[in-house]
């Protein structure tokens, strides 16, 4: 996940600034592309099947986050599933309610991309192709980072600078070509 996001987010930031399309809509369109390639209906698919809320899983995750308890982690996992279910809207009525509520509270522009659209946004077609190429490159990158991390763990020394990137846009995203 770190490899993919740290590779893609600078480009996504450039896409946002170039097109005005929100981060969530660009990622939603990329999710659609990946699901369609696997013959999954993106409008009906609940993508939280891999999340298993429990105190035991919370105990595994909590040490990675300062000030979070296993109970808070479990609650977060339950909330993630709940909100994904809220935003899963294959039917007209629920879609109208969701989008109407978003407009009512002034959050439509930032949030509508969290609900899978019925049809792809044609403005995102080329962006998704670029993200697919970056996705393909992130897999070997992740494998290499894992090896570098293990080497650091077992042999000491400094982490390579690649580990200092964040999930954000980073530096020089403005110079990227789409």
Located regions from the model:
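Long, contiguous binding/interaction regions
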Residues: 1
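N-terminal leader/auxiliary helical segments
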Residues: 5-178
């Amino acid at each position: 996940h770190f490899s993919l996001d740290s590779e893609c987010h600078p480009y996504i930031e450039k896409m946002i600034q170039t097109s005005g399309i929100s981060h969530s809509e660009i990622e939603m369109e990329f999710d659609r592309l990946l699901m369609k390639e696997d013959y999954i209906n993106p409008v009906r698919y609940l993508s939280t099947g891999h999340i298993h809320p429990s105190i035991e899983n919370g105990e595994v995750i909590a040490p990675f986050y300062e000030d979070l308890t296993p109970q808070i982690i479990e609650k977060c996992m339950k909330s993630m599933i709940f909100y994904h279910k809220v935003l899963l809207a294959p039917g007209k009525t629920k879609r109208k309610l969701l989008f109407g509520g978003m407009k009512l509270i002034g959050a439509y522009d930032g949030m509508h991309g969290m609900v899978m659209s019925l049809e792809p946004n044609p403005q995102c077609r080329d962006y998704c192709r670029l993200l697919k190429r970056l996705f393909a490159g992130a897999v070997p990158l992740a494998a290499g980072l894992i090896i570098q991390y293990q080497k650091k763990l077992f042999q000491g020394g400094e982490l390579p600078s690649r580990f200092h990137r964040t999930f954000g846009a980073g530096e020089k995203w403005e110079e990227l070509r789409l």
